[in-house]
Amino acid sequence: MARTKQSARKSHGGKAPTKQLATKAARKSAPTTGGVKKPHRFRPGTVALREIRKYQKSTELLNRKLPFQRLVREIAQDFKTDLRFQSHAVLALQEAAEAYLVGLFEDTNLCAIHAKRVTIMPKDVQLARRIRAERA
């Protein structure tokens, strides 16, 4: 490259523009030290719809077995102490309880949709139970 003659310029009290360009270039070319990649986030509702499809396909129990068994034993103790349960009896109770809850949530969802909402609320559960004549 050929050298060119530089003419004198009057300073206006600011920083030299060459320094600014140098720092910008340094920032662009320098590797980012905090290069932690953000985890991928799905749009709201996508994961919920995927879970709905997953659980509608499956037939396994949704509640854990041991916590449900402890709950059954705790409730049964109010009526009679030293009761014993066959494992199949607890499983039958759990199947019935989950079937009841799934049906209740289906009716609750219909009540929310009827109210032009997509979010279920306690008043939807109360209405569904009232229509079923479970609670007057």
Curated annotation (Swiss-Prot):
The modification N6,N6,N6-trimethyllysine is found at residues 5, 10, 28, 37. Expressed in roots, seedlings, leaves, buds and open flowers. This is Histone H3-like 1. It comes from Arabidopsis thaliana. Residues 1-43 are annotated as: Disordered. The modification N6-methyllysine is found at residues 5, 10, 19, 24, 28, 37. The keyword Phosphoprotein applies. Belongs to the histone H3 family. The modification N6-acetyllysine is found at residues 10, 15, 19, 24. Keywords: Acetylation, Chromosome, DNA-binding, Methylation, Nucleosome core, Nucleus, Phosphoprotein. Core component of nucleosome. Nucleosomes wrap and compact DNA into chromatin, limiting DNA accessibility to the cellular machineries which require DNA as a template. Histones thereby play a central role in transcription regulation, DNA repair, DNA replication and chromosomal stability. DNA accessibility is regulated via a complex set of post-translational modifications of histones, also called histone code, and nucleosome remodeling. The nucleosome is a histone octamer containing two molecules each of H2A, H2B, H3 and H4 assembled in one H3-H4 heterotetramer and two H2A-H2B heterodimers. The octamer wraps approximately 147 bp of DNA.
